[in-house]
Amino acid sequence: MSVSVETRDLSISFGTEPNAVKVLPGVSFSVQPGECFGLVGESGSGKSTVLRCVSMLTDFWKGEVLIAGKSVRDMPLIDRCRILQMVFQDPYGSLHPRQSVRTVLNEPLVIHKLGDREERMRKAITDVGLPVSFLDRFPHQLSGGQRQRVAIARALILEPSLLLLDEPTSALDVSVQAEILNLLQRLREERGFTYIMVTHDLAVVDHMCDRFAVMLRGEITEILPRQAIAGNGATHDYARELIGASLEYEGAH
């Protein structure tokens, strides 16, 4: 089932007053059920921080985050983990090096007291395009792309409605990036997931997202449809510059 997401005046500071640094001064956006919504901008613009706030990995923010109209702060942890999952940037750092794929996938099933564990693990691993035999492999026996597929399988195994994707392909080779993006696209079409995707790459946005927000110094400068990329339909100076630079790069390659 798809869910909507809404942030209202989401703000967060790091450090103590009077030297606290405001990383997000007040971010507001909404995501429709089944939509893929992108967050783009330069490094340090607050994109990943937004995901950490939405997921409650960072919990000392102010404002509101609503999923299907319910505040994430009011959701019990066990319920929140069933609704949303996150896929991280580094497939080499997101899996425990001494745990087999079977252990990685079984752990959330044990925590949530779900039955049919073997069947669920087999389905999760084959859904991401890996054979069942990979359940008995360890991370060092997998390529970067295979590790990221396992990370996606771990996110899928609790059957969430919302996936938070923090640059899920940036650490991978170009050919593998395309495979992972196509996998994510297929899964969204088949299951109706809602995605919020952080990326530096506007080509990824063009391939994956319905709309995207351009962030600068913790603020959203503009929210645009995917179609605005090809003709650089942005109105904010920074957004136009960012899209223009991406188009020039793509044209040169």
Question: Model-flagged regions — what are they?
Answer:
Residues 40-42:
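The feature captures the beta-strand-to-loop junction immediately N-terminal to the Walker
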Residues 118-133, 244:
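Conserved ABC ATPase "signature" region
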Residues 138-142, 146:
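Conserved ABC ATPase signature
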Residues 55:
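Helix-to-loop junction immediately C-terminal to a conserved catalytic motif
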Residues 17-18, 71-85, 99, 111, ...:
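ABC ATPase NBD coupling module
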Residues 63-73:
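Conserved ABC transporter NBD signature motif
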